[in-house]
Amino acid sequence: MSDPSFPQGDAGSQDAARRWRVGVLGATGLVGQRLVKLLADHPWFELTEVAASERSSGKTYANAVHWHLDGPIPAVARDLVVKGLDPSLDCDFVFSALDSSVAGQTEEDFARAGYPVLSNSKNHRMDPDVPLLIPEVNASHLDAISFQQKNRGYDTGFIVTNPNCSTAGLVLVLKPLADAFGLEKIFVVTLQAVSGAGYPGVASMDIHGNVVPFISGEEEKMESEPQKLLGKWDGTRFIEAGLGLSAHCNRVPVLDGHTECVSLSLKKVASLAEVREALRDFEVSAELASLPSAVRHPVVVLDEQDRPQPRRDANVGNGMAAVVGRVRECPLLDVKLTLLSHNLVRGAAGGALLNAELLAARGFFKGRSVVEGEALAEPVSR
């Protein structure tokens, strides 16, 4: 069921006689599985293709996947035959949940063949002509797509990425504070769930009763990606936000949900009440509210002293909200707080799905094999 605290919008009117056919690259991994589950009942998108490595190619999805999510494999996916990573899939666009070792070239091949690519992989996030997108934060960065297509010689294809799982929650919280008060410096320490490492991920002997104070490449992503997300597109390049940002990233024995302890300095003086108000009042536009996966208030502020907690709060807003608590004065900077976001939903599959919904609503999908005569439905509860 949808959380009643987070009203879902009505489906948009764009291309109202179409349902878009979707493929998932890397469909057998954890993020790929989450995408398959989210797509199973989606009112706008129909899952028609699943693709993975040659090891899985030719098998039915049910026989190829080691299913790790709650509930059974969705019926729509069970009997789909897993294809290889060749850009000849019968779909209108693809999600990429591929490992970074193969994602870079594969995503370029699909885009060059005319497929819009919604990527969860790191490879193209910081490319100078590729939008790194959180719709509530920087939807205007989609203006870079036409430049990318011209720059790379793509026709109808393009690449849009979503950020690192920890970056996603952090920037959702930073956005209303940047708009209201301006930001100067951010210091963040993460406590990241093991599901963020994929499967089999971190060995149980390494993580059980332990904390691992290193995640390869994670701190670099958290220090660079917010600069692009909170920056601007000037027509030919992205101009970074120019923030001072330092990150420490740790793997902890939690299944789902990344917790982040954040201290920050503001350009304008603000009381704690004003900071809480800015976070609570952060509301998406009418355009975004019409998207099936959107939550009207993507930042939720809790007053309890011991919240947020991954076990209790990771699924707030169907996993699409960032949950904030412990907003207080910082003796070194200005304000400190704790935030939590679901790393596999907002930080991965759900974020990519919301990106695709915005692209569909704005008419970026031209359609290779559109199912005609099926109207976009009202958003469904998941």
Q: Which residues does each predicted region cover?
A:
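Charged docking surfaces used in two-component/phosphorelay signaling
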Residues: 194-382
